[in-house]
Amino acid sequence: LKECVAIDSDAHRLVRVEENLARLNHHATLICAEAQEVEGWHNGELFDRILLDAPCSATGVIRRHPDIRWLRQASDIAPLVAIQAQLLQQMWQILKPGGKLLYATCSIFPEENAQQIQAFIEQHPEAEIIALPPELHSVSTATNAIGLQILPGNGNMDGFYYALLHKPSQS
């Protein structure tokens, strides 16, 4: 790994990231910014790999935070889906040809997960879905052609969704 860049809009989260990196004897460039406002933080260099831990409804953490059931409303989902789509589009633009983008949420809603990735692929037919490692499938409850969904409690984990995309090299 040549360089790692972490972007978060919450300075307090970045402090925790910095503490964890120091504990593990790793280094990263930490940037406090809105990731979707690329022009404000991006230096023009394309990334080989991107982990997009997208803002989401956090419905996957319901077993540890049961109050989320009352804190979330149906009207919360559409704005989150729009932000996720914007982030996917912008991160795809700064991903190098031949690069990989891992999209992740802690949501259990298809609109934020497989449907989001399906819509992205329809707009970017060049994007290739890469199968995730088989060992992850043991905790998954919904493995399909579009990512992997872990439901809360499976493997004593929170709920998560992952989809790995590859941006083909230009020929």
Place the predicted regions along the sequence by residue.
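S-adenosylmethionine
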Residues: 1-171
